[in-house]
Amino acid sequence: MRVTVLDHPLVAHKLSVLREKDTPSPVFRQLVEELVTLLAYEATRDVRVEPVTIQTPVAETQGTALTRPRPLVVPILRAGLGMLEGMTHLIPTAEVGFLGMARDDATLDIITYAERLPDDLTGRQVYVLDPMLATGGTLSEAIKFLYRRGAQDITCVCLLAAPEGLDRLEKELGDSEVNVVLASVDERLDENAYIVPGLGDAGDRLYGVVD
C-alpha cells in the first residue's frame, strides 16, 4: 500500500477552514470540492493514457488521451458523494459508480446497503472517494468489494485519516497495490472512533444532520 499526504499550502489552508466548527455547510461543500480537485491531481498521476494524433490550427501533431475504458470514480455514500464534483472537474469523462456503505455506530460493523457498479471491473482504474479514513473498516470493505468484481488498480482519495485506519488497511490488504491520497494524517481515534482533531462527521457537515 502506498500512502501520499499532499504537502501544499492551499491544501493546508482549505483543510483548516474545513476543520473550523463554525464553517457553514455551503462553504464546507465548496471547500471539499476545491480540496478534492487538488487531491485528484496527485491521485491521477498514474492515470492511463495513450498517444493520439491531433490537428491544431497550424499543423498535425502528437497528443495524449485517456485510454478506454475510462477511469471509474466510486464515491462511498453518503459523504463520498460530496467529493464527486471535485474529482470529475479534473476527469470529466470518467464513469461514475456508487457504493453505499455505512458504519453501525453500536457495533462498528460495516453494512453495504446499495451498489451501482459494472459487474466486471477487470482492467479498470478505480478511484474510491471517502472523506474520512477513521477505523479503516468502510474503506477496507469497499476495496474488497471492488476486488471481487475484478478491480486491481485502486486509488483511494480521502480528506483525513487516522493512523489506526491506515494500519488496518495495511494489515487487511497485505501487499496489494492500493494507493491512498490524503490531505492529512491526524493524531488518533477517540473512544467513539472519530478522528482527532478531525473535522466532525463529514456527511452531517456536508448535508446537515438527517435522522
From Swiss-Prot:
Keyword GTP-binding carried by entry: yes
* Record pathway: Pyrimidine metabolism; UMP biosynthesis via salvage pathway; UMP from uracil: step 1/1
Q: Which cofactors?
A: Mg(2+)
Extract the GO molecular function terms from the UniProt entry: GTP binding; magnesium ion binding; uracil phosphoribosyltransferase activity
Q: Which UniProt keywords apply?
A: Allosteric enzyme, Glycosyltransferase, GTP-binding, Magnesium, Nucleotide-binding, Transferase
Record Pfam families: UPRTase
Q: Where does uracil bind?
A: 195, 200-202
Enzyme Commission (EC) number: 2.4.2.9
Report the domain of life of the source organism: Bacteria
User: What does the Swiss-Prot or TrEMBL cofactor note state?
Assistant: Binds 1 Mg(2+) ion per subunit. The magnesium is bound as Mg-PRPP.
Recorded catalytic reaction(s): these are:
UMP + diphosphate = 5-phospho-alpha-D-ribose 1-diphosphate + uracil
InterPro entries per UniProt: PRibTrfase_dom (IPR000836), PRTase-like (IPR029057), Upp_B (IPR034332), UPRTase/APRTase (IPR050054), Ura_phspho_trans (IPR005765)
Among its keywords, does the record have Transcription regulation? no
Q: Which GO terms describe its biological process?
A: UMP salvage; uracil salvage
Please tell me where 5-phospho-alpha-D-ribose 1-diphosphate binds in this chain.
78, 103, 130-138, 201
What top-tier enzyme class does this entry carry?
A: transferase
Question: How is this protein activated or inhibited?
Answer: Allosterically activated by GTP.
What's its job?
Catalyzes the conversion of uracil and 5-phospho-alpha-D-ribose 1-diphosphate (PRPP) to UMP and diphosphate.
Q: Which family does it belong to?
A: Belongs to the UPRTase family.
Protein name per the record? Uracil phosphoribosyltransferase
Name its species. Kocuria rhizophila (strain ATCC 9341 / DSM 348 / NBRC 103217 / DC2201)
